[in-house]
């Protein structure tokens, strides 16, 4: 099962897939298990026709970025080839022998052979089947090796369709590749062996192909980007995303401390960053009081709504990159109410967001409400 929307059934779409081990148990602690899972992800991708763009296998969950292309005609020869990648040469030989025997039985047998081929075709070009193959295989292998019984995976996997634009896709891949850094599992961007970025730096063809897809834009002289240029661009992206994450983490610590909760510094933050976040929170709260007083002077509901929209734009101008939760603090409106105002302003072209869940900026078009 998946909690993805119906959009995940559309073709020519990019998907961010995540799945967690049940109860956050570290079943992927052993290096061999992570290696085997990556190998099955590769094999399942070949069989289903899904294109791997990136991956990261952590000790209790995994991330995959994949492209689902439009289906192509798959004849018997191609089915057997893909089945061989998935099940091995012996598995493909067994299927081929089964088909041959059925065809010796006449018309009825030929129809049954075609039915079996159609069963395999229907498993292709499907994100759901791709994930099912990966998770089912890993469960069976893990249980067999470790005499384990019971649930291994934490319910449904999560499948988010990523907007088909360069900025959103590269940022999603960057988020995936930052997982080991945020978890203190490595100190460098390419230092985690079970990340596709590490594989890319080591010359892995699948990882290189995925990165080329993500960084598919041309240079000014219309040539394809060299691998070192892709690496430079990606590491610059990772550095920027990591800095934003550090600042967000410092703000979380500052908020907890302001609420009287214990919040120790972690490896990626400093007391100086937390102090800066505390100053920012104080400024935001002061601005909130001022805006609240301005709103109370407004008359009708329509006038108050216009005032709130203007406050949102003013706050975004004052704090470029401000996030939705910070706007809630400033404006003192409900989460659902804020989202309605943000949706209206974004639709009008007055504001824009840095990808899904990112900070807000005034639109380059500068449209006013």
Feature-to-residue mapping (PLM):
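Charged, glycine-enriched surface loops/patches
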Residues: 360
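Short Pro-Cys-Gly-centered "Cys-loop" motif that presents a nucleophilic cysteine in a tight turn
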Residues: 1-59, 67-355, 364-369
